[in-house]
Amino acid sequence: MIALDPTPDRDAHGRDGTGRRWTPGARLVGDEPEVEPADGAPTVGVLALQGDVLEHLRALRRCGARAVEVRTPAELDTVEGIVLPGGESTTIGKLLERSGLLEPLRERIRAGLPAFGTCAGMILLSAELAQDRVQPLLGLLGVRTRRNAYGRQVDSFDVALDVTGIDGGPVDVSFIRAPRVEEVLSDDVEVLAEVDGHPVVVRQGRILAAAFHPEVTGDDRLHRSFVALVSSTRD
């Protein structure tokens, strides 16, 4: 069963009564000591053009990966896996084009680079959008995705979600202006979790995508699963 946690009272800008901007799960994400990765740890990049970069870096490091920011094709060449974070998918897509990263990123993922897209990252990976909207997409994941399917920032909510392949009970995640999969377009896509009958976690080969923000709740199991995937694909 999916459990929804109420969010604190806040205004239209997401600020609570203290004037601070509220993000679901943010209470669990704070300053953490740097952890030196073990010898032989996989190098996992986080696309760092816009969006929720720092929390992904921290989660990956807690999972034992050597986590680095990726902003250029040269930096992309150094990683063994890539996380596409939440943020604003149109902005990230345009910055991918402007930075010269769009085609190199598409080709590396197509060639087998493990990729994990969350929220906006899922949108970028998708083959199609449900809305009539022109924006850059990588087009590698066989799904049709609807942007902002769960409402605006003020409609954000937390979920305890059962995810196929993740042990230890439901995973705590946050839906923040989240997309959802409207239609699976390929038999190669495996649905790992649903909300109200719509897929919200899918996998296609070495591509993992989630409609929510797993990085802000402190539950690192999806990141740990992705780091394990990256490690398993090494020569």
What are these regions (language model features)?
Residues 53, 76, 124, 131, ...:
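Flexible, glycine-rich phosphate/dinucleotide-binding loops
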Residues 41, 79, 111-113, 135-136, ...:
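Short coil/turn connectors at secondary-structure junctions
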Residues 49, 120, 212:
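Cofactor-binding loop segments of dinucleotide-utilizing enzymes, especially the Rossmann-like FAD-
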Residues 1-35, 147-235:
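Amide-donor transfer/coupling interface in amidating biosynthetic enzymes
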Residues 67-68, 115, 207:
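Hydrophobic anchor at the start of a short beta-strand
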Residues 88-162:
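Cysteine-nucleophile active-site neighborhood
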Residues 84, 117, 210:
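Redox-cofactor binding/interface segments in oxidoreductases and associated redox assembly factors
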Residues 1-98, 103-108, 220-235:
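N-terminal beta1-alpha1 cap of cysteine-dependent amidohydrolase-like domains
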